[in-house]
């Protein structure tokens, strides 16, 4: 028998787990709009208070994937998603979005799943729009973009229409729920590799093991000790690495890669326009902390995508494509593709 919403709520009140298959049943009911807003908010609160388990997160992610509009990709070699849970409150420029162009220029296929602002002054969708890109591409257009430019940006509302059911509840609650950690787990292109930033140290090991359960090939889940949901320049970064079916947890520091430490305040921006300006400076290879943090994160993406043999090798490759203009050319090609694709309908 499927678990009822009332039974699920009772479990959370008693700090007991909703098992994987039960979570699948429950999430299907929620995504179909069969559970009242009051009950959804109660369950989300209960899960948050008792802390979501690996099985609960994996079960919920399985259903979100099931309900998504997929991007059909035949060749997933060297494919990677560079994504963060957001919510770190750092208000930095769009580091992962900038790293996307560098990683693509370096030989990865970047299938980035994103949305509007959560923790930065502008989310990945906001940043791409500020750069002139059209973000609301249909799944077949994203697949074509990936094939032609090495980049496919999947705007979450286009690919997860069922999320409209819970949007009003999430908006009214105004606090983090399980849905904040599900987004990065539900890439519509099925990227087998992922560089994921998280907003809390506990999530490093949890999300790496959720990805393991969901069948990911390789992953780096990262949290900077200064609170950033990226590999950080301002402090050490906790890493949960999934490779060869095993999860290993360790810590890295910018000095390990010959990069000078720099406080995250040097990366802060006030709005999307400032974020755009800093991103373009990086892609134009202007030296400074912004360039360094993008090279670090793009290098990690190239490593997890299997293009580079190590993060250090990935950083070398990232700096090469920044210096020779390939990363900037990748941005220009992507923006042009999105504009042409939508103009053609």
Curated annotation (Swiss-Prot):
Belongs to the anthranilate phosphoribosyltransferase family. Anthranilate 1 binds at residues 84, 115. Anthranilate 2 binds at residue 170. Its cofactor is Mg(2+). Pathway: Amino-acid biosynthesis; L-tryptophan biosynthesis; L-tryptophan from chorismate: step 2/5. Catalyzes the transfer of the phosphoribosyl group of 5-phosphorylribose-1-pyrophosphate (PRPP) to anthranilate to yield N-(5'-phosphoribosyl)-anthranilate (PRA). SUPFAM superfamilies: Nucleoside phosphorylase/phosphoribosyltransferase catalytic domain, Nucleoside phosphorylase/phosphoribosyltransferase N-terminal domain. This is Anthranilate phosphoribosyltransferase. The keyword Magnesium applies. The lineage of its organism: Bacteria, Pseudomonadati, Pseudomonadota, Gammaproteobacteria, Lysobacterales. Its EC number is 2.4.2.18. PANTHER family: ANTHRANILATE PHOSPHORIBOSYLTRANSFERASE (PTHR43285:SF2). Homodimer. Mg(2+) 1 binds at residues 96, 230. Keywords: Amino-acid biosynthesis, Aromatic amino acid biosynthesis, Glycosyltransferase, Magnesium, Metal-binding, Transferase, Tryptophan biosynthesis. InterPro entries: Anthranilate_Pribosyl_Tfrase (IPR005940), Glycosyl_Trfase_fam3 (IPR000312), Glycosyl_Trfase_fam3_N_dom (IPR017459), Glycosyl_Trfase_fam3_N_dom_sf (IPR036320), Nuc_phospho_transferase (IPR035902). GO terms for cellular component: cytosol. Binds 2 magnesium ions per monomer. GO terms for biological process: L-tryptophan biosynthetic process. It catalyses: N-(5-phospho-beta-D-ribosyl)anthranilate + diphosphate = 5-phospho-alpha-D-ribose 1-diphosphate + anthranilate. It is an enzyme of class 2 (transferase). Transmembrane segments: none annotated. One of its GO terms (molecular function) is magnesium ion binding. 5-phospho-alpha-D-ribose 1-diphosphate binds at residues 84, 87-88, 92, 94-97, 112-120, 124. Mg(2+) 2 binds at residues 229-230. It comes from the Bacteria. The gene is trpD.
């Amino acid at each position: 028998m499927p678990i009822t919403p009332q039974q699920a709520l009772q479990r959370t009140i008693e700090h007991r787990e909703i098992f994987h298959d039960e979570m699948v049943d429950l999430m299907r009911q929620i995504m179909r709009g069969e559970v009242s807003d009051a009950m959804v908010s109660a369950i989300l609160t209960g899960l948050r208070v008792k802390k979501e388990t690996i099985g609960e997160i994996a079960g919920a992610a399985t259903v979100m994937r099931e309900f998504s509009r997929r991007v059909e990709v035949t060749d997933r070699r060297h494919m990677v998603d560079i994504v963060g849970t957001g919510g770190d409150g750092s208000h930095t420029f769009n580091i992962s979005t900038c790293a996307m162009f560098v990683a693509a220029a370096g030989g990865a296929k970047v299938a980035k799943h994103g949305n509007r602002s959560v923790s930065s002054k502008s989310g990945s969708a906001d940043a791409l729009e500020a750069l002139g890109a059209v973000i609301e591409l249909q799944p077949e257009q994203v697949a074509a973009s990936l094939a032609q430019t090495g980049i496919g940006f999947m705007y979450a509302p286009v690919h997860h229409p069922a999320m409209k059911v819970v949007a009003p509840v999430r908006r009214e609650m105004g606090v983090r729920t399980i849905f904040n950690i599900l987004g990065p787990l539900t890439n519509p292109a099925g990227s087998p590799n992922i560089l994921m930033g998280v907003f809390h140290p506990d999530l490093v090991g949890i999300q790496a093991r959720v990805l393991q359960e969901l069948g990911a090939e390789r992953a780096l889940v990262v949290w900077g000790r200064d609170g950033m949901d990226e590999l950080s320049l301002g402090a050490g970064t906790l890493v949960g690495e999934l490779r060869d079916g095993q999860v290993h947890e360790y810590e890295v520091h910018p000095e390990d890669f010959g990069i000078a430490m720099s406080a995250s305040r040097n990366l802060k921006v006030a709005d999307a326009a400032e974020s755009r300006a800093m991103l373009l400076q990086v892609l134009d290879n202007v030296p400074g902390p912004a360039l360094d943090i993008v090279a670090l994160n793009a290098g990690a993406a190239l490593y997890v995508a299997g293009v580079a043999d190590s993060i250090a090798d990935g950083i070398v490759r990232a700096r090469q494509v920044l210096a020779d203009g390939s990363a900037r050319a990748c941005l220009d090609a992507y923006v042009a593709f999105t504009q042409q694709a939508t103009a053609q309908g």
